[in-house]
């Protein structure tokens, strides 16, 4: 299959060609910066159709299906008005949704099969497992997971991660980090008078509280293609998410680290 994912910074489409045995055969990116700079909606639509043709032509060249996240998980139109990184990210998602619909439409017209999967945790799994293991960017790694999921593969935790989750000291260290972070954010929020900054602190506090809740829950299954695509849920915290909150910010210093090589095991 040829699997797709999008990245906001730099703004491009990541493609991963995945063989039937689940291995990564090839990967590449298509820049979407020109779409971002398009002077009007008509010009943007033409560029998106051009990229859709490139994607479908690549799938035809290799004789494979196209794998994407399910369209129902994507925004259906433009909303809001504003600027800044968060707004640009939202606009990029709207453009990505439009691009995927074009890819789906064009692929079906040309007789190329389209496989849709639930994208839940594909980015997290990609960043934790394949980005460090195969030296991939996080978006290519996410596309790879989408492709493997479309082929029916289940993502198992590497032994190093299994050992880490079984290490009580790791979980305690992560818990202490987020507890201290939550206390610091509460203090900053109490002393902050600017409304926009208070709102930002509230969002950060909510994330820290969510991490504490996740770290205090018993671990469930690390997840599988079946569980995600068919909607079945297993009890307990998702092990991939526990690893993400336990490693990214406490150990690597960022919620979405650019360099994931320290996680290579």
Name each model-derived stretch:
Residues 1-265:
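Positively charged, helix-rich recognition surfaces that bind polyanionic ligands
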């Amino acid at each position: 299959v040829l699997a797709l994912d999008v990245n906001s910074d730099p703004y491009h489409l990541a493609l991963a060609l995945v063989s039937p045995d689940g291995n990564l055969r090839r990967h590449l990116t298509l820049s979407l910066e020109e779409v971002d700079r398009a002077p009007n909606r008509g010009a943007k639509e033409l560029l998106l159709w051009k990229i859709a043709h490139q994607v479908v032509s690549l799938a035809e060249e290799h004789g494979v299906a196209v794998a994407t996240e399910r369209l129902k998980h994507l925004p259906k139109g433009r909303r809001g008005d504003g600027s800044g990184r968060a707004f640009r990210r939202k606009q990029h998602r709207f453009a990505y949704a439009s691009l995927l619909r074009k890819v789906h439409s064009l692929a079906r017209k040309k007789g190329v099969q389209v496989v849709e999967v639930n994208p839940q945790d594909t980015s997290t799994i990609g960043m934790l497992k394949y980005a460090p293991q195969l030296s991939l960017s996080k978006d290519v790694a996410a596309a790879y997971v989408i492709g493997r999921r479309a082929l029916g593969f289940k993502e198992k935790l590497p032994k190093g991660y299994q050992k880490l989750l079984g290490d009580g000291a790791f979980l305690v260290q992560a818990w202490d980090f987020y507890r201290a972070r939550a206390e610091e954010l509460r203090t900053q929020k109490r002393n902050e008078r600017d409304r926009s900054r208070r709102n930002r602190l509230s969002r950060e506090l909510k994330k820290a509280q969510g991490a504490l809740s996740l770290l205090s829950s018993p671990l469930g299954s690390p997840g599988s293609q079946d569980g995600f695509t068919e909607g079945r849920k297993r009890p307990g915290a998702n092990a991939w998410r526990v690893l993400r909150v336990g490693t990214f910010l406490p150990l690597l210093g960022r919620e979405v680290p650019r360099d994931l090589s320290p996680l290579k095991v």
